[in-house]
């Protein structure tokens, strides 16, 4: 499996939906196959590149703009970029698609809110419900579910390896990697 043209897999979903788990599993499979790949994890980027940003609507927009530009740069070098970012609004995902262009794949990593809360080892949802965390997506700020995602992976119903298989099949069908 080698890069035909690279791609950006833009994983969107609530905190705890399984974006990072799926992203890391896909990354491993791509690397094992000799494919240049990188994970851009929203949590990691917020501790580094985007450490100057908060969670206001303006800061979220800027955070995702930066992620999209970095993703596009890697894709142009033949990488499969796996961006695991909440990107809660339709406009954020549209803007990312416009920045990246051809090769953008929107993946809705979906799990019910109750499942996401049950998976939350850090207790962020509980803190948000107590009002200790402002602008928390899914609690005090809305999450706009994608209306036309390229793929939907329901992590409460599908094992990780099956989700990875679906993602790889989609990339092959698109001609972004060879099978």
Curated annotation (Swiss-Prot):
InterPro entries, per the entry: APS_kinase (IPR002891), P-loop_NTPase (IPR027417), Sulf_AdTrans/APS_kinase (IPR050512)
Range of residues in the leader sequence: none
SUPFAM superfamilies, per database record: P-loop containing nucleoside triphosphate hydrolases
Reaction equations catalysed: adenosine 5'-phosphosulfate + ATP = 3'-phosphoadenylyl sulfate + ADP + H(+)
Gene Ontology molecular function terms on file: adenylylsulfate kinase activity; ATP binding; sulfate adenylyltransferase (ATP) activity
GO-annotated biological processes: hydrogen sulfide biosynthetic process; sulfate assimilation via adenylyl sulfate reduction; sulfate assimilation, phosphoadenylyl sulfate reduction by phosphoadenylyl-sulfate reductase (thioredoxin)
Active-site feature positions: 87
EC number annotated for this UniProt entry: 2.7.1.25
The organism's place on the tree of life at top rank: Bacteria
Family (UniProt): Belongs to the APS kinase family.
Matching PANTHER family: SULFATE ADENYLYLTRANSFERASE (PTHR42700:SF1)
Primary role: Catalyzes the synthesis of activated sulfate.
Entry-linked NCBIfam families: apsK, PRK03846.1
UniProt-recorded name of the protein: Adenylyl-sulfate kinase
UniProt source species: Paraburkholderia xenovorans (strain LB400)
